[in-house]
């Protein structure tokens, strides 16, 4: 185990109270209803992971399942104290950076701002702090957020989102550490923390169907002989091959980059790639520190300091005796 970070321990020891804000379920329900009723508009946000992997969001390989729908890789960070004391509340700060000037393709083909979402896998026994335990200062940081357990019996795995990205590039999770004195299944030591965070819409729905947030490609080699616009605002591209005509249907959103009469090979892009978002994953660690160990260490350090002081005093006494003998 690493040497304790005393600044982090001291900070954690001052956080004696904590709480989580329970807010507008109706607002969250509105988000959920919108995404279920119009899935093209906000695909593959954290709760979609619950459908594709209901047991755990982390695969055996260590990959978070959100990466199955968000194919582009983007950075994500999580900042937590190096060590925490039992039964204390601390902040886990998730950072989801992106260019705020970016505009993503929405389900209807129009452009709009990016949303963000995250899944935070805490160690067993750690959970979102109840409202009455959250300090007022921290409560201000989590105002407007709704944290949901990944499963009803899995409080240590938490999801949040979708949220407007221009307001929530940083998301604060108020986390309550467990107490081994009351929970015998928990032990002091070092534990892993896993984060998965996305910004923007995904490229694949949980059903495996592609969203319109993709670059669409030719399935066969041939010549583009016809391009027509569909009623929905997309395109129908006819490619004449040696085996006949192949019609490629492109939903609204991506921009065509081919023209009539152009030769294309199988796999060539017919459109640009409109995706400006992506998924990021980050792993870190936290130490659940024993107060007894800290006290013992403090006593040990105090003993060393006392021994040094006594040695200095003893040295002075010896020097006085030697000086007296020389004068005699």
Swiss-Prot record:
Residues that, per the record, bind heme: 45, 66, 69-70
Q: Molecular function terms in GO for this entry?
A: electron transfer activity; heme binding; iron ion binding
Q: How does it sit in the membrane?
A: Single-pass membrane protein
Q: How is the cofactor bound?
A: Binds 1 heme group covalently.
A single GO cellular-component term from the record reads: plasma membrane-derived thylakoid membrane
Is Membrane found in the keyword set?
yes
Renumbered to this chain, the signal peptide range is 1-44
Transmembrane portions of the chain: 294-314
Provide this UniProt record's keywords sorted from A to Z.
Answer: Electron transport, Heme, Iron, Membrane, Metal-binding, Photosynthesis, Signal, Thylakoid, Transmembrane, Transmembrane helix, Transport
Question: Which cofactors, by name?
Answer: heme
Question: In which compartments does the protein localize?
Answer: Cellular thylakoid membrane
Q: Which GO terms describe its biological process?
A: photosynthesis
- Pfam families per UniProt: Apocytochr_F_C (PF01333), Apocytochr_F_N (PF16639)
The record's listing under PROSITE patterns reads: CYTF
Q: Which InterPro entries match?
A: Cyt-f_TM, Cyt_f, Cyt_f_lg_dom, Cyt_f_lg_dom_sf, Rudment_hybrid_motif
Q: How does it assemble?
A: The 4 large subunits of the cytochrome b6-f complex are cytochrome b6, subunit IV (17 kDa polypeptide, PetD), cytochrome f and the Rieske protein, while the 4 small subunits are PetG, PetL, PetM and PetN. The complex functions as a dimer.
UniProt-listed NCBIfam families: PRK02693.1
Function according to Swiss-Prot or TrEMBL: Component of the cytochrome b6-f complex, which mediates electron transfer between photosystem II (PSII) and photosystem I (PSI), cyclic electron flow around PSI, and state transitions.
PANTHER family attached to this UniProt entry: CYTOCHROME F, PTHR33288
As for family, the record states: Belongs to the cytochrome f family.
Instruction: Write the protein's name.
Output: Cytochrome f
Q: State the gene name recorded for this protein.
A: petA
